[in-house]
Amino acid sequence: MLFRSVYRSSNAAISNWWNHLNTVLLALISNKEVAIDKAELMVTTPFTGISLPNGLYLNYPDLVRTTSGDFSYQTRTGRNKIYGGKVAENLCQAVARCIIGEQMINIEKRYRVVLTVHDAIACVVPVDEADEARSYIEECMRTPPKWAVGLPLNCESGMAQTYGDC
């Protein structure tokens, strides 16, 4: 408990956002619209979920608040507990997925994407275009989507005959 208190007092902005996300869970239950972020790129949408910047939604099916004040939602395997910190994690992962999805679309304009692993994209490129392909792919991965102008993105890349050798 001491570690948690020290972390929260040392990182008040994060702790405040987690608390805000608990109010977002209440808004979802009440079917009210609430902004997730100051730029209002993400908002709760009544009867739908949290709208993400690219138009997709993050949903918590059958979200309820228990008598003890906890939140839970239905999954295929039962009910899962959810809370502000977990919503923050889900939002970060969802936005990262939106970004890498747009990056893959841009890369696909020139090179075939054959695999993604978390935040990594693997492509098959002609050997004689390897350096040019690397530059193009890095440029695509460093370019934020239109809805995230100014977001600092960076990447590292490697080239090899097999994915395991990168």
Positions of predicted regions on the chain:
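Conserved catalytic core of nucleotide polymerization and phosphodiester-bond processing enzymes
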Residues: 1-166
